[in-house]
Amino acid sequence: MNTFSAKDLVTRSCMQIRMFAEHPERKQQPSQMVEYGEKFQRAVADTIPNIVGEEMRGTYTNGCLSIHFSNDIVCPDKIIEVKSVVGNAPEWYLRSSVLQCAFYKSMIMQGFNHLETASFLVNQGYERKAINVLPWINYVLIFGEEKFKIEVESPNAIINFFLRKAEACTDWNLARNFDFVNKHREYEILSDYFKYHMIF
């Protein structure tokens, strides 16, 4: 079974994912920005009622591929992805965040809707919680001070793209060829299959 992080499939190139698979020691250690993001997420969570849990992980499987995705905040009626923003965020960061949400929502829409507290939190002493969310559950992106609702019109198209990317990550030549065609174009390629709008 080849296992991938959904976030990595959205934010990293095939070559980078392949390299880190062979050399995990080269991954960067958490930065101050990561710590700031975690604090921002906790602050957001403190303002939201009826939270089932934070960092609740789902798993999508297809043949010999397994893709894990972690949802920041899960409520009975919505899932919230939280991104901290310092200053004026570049457009690519918003697009990457929206695409990440669209991918996660697509997997949930296709029935991979069982979410459990991530193991790293359980190992820290947090209670393990689990929920089967509705496949059509609302998905919200909090991007700094802005909020967006994510809607997916063709979950299969989005999932199939990232399945092809995951398969390409298993071989250096396939990874190189995939990146040559798709690197930095993921949002453009998939933009017909999802939409988002600001909410208040």
Across the structure, where does each feature detected by a protein language model lie?
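Metal-dependent nuclease catalytic cores that hydrolyze phosphodiester bonds in DNA/RNA
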Residues: M1-C75, F200
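General helical secondary-structure elements
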Residues: D8, C14, E35, G53, ...
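Intrinsic-disorder-associated interaction segments
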Residues: D8-V10, M33, G37, D72, ...
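Alpha-helix boundary/capping residues
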Residues: S13-I17, P24, I108, K165, ...
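Charged, low-complexity surface segments at secondary-structure and domain boundaries
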Residues: A21-P30, G144-V152, W172-F178
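Mg2+/Mn2+-dependent nuclease catalytic core
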Residues: G58-T170
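Non-catalytic C-terminal interaction segments of nucleic acid-processing enzymes
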Residues: N156-F200
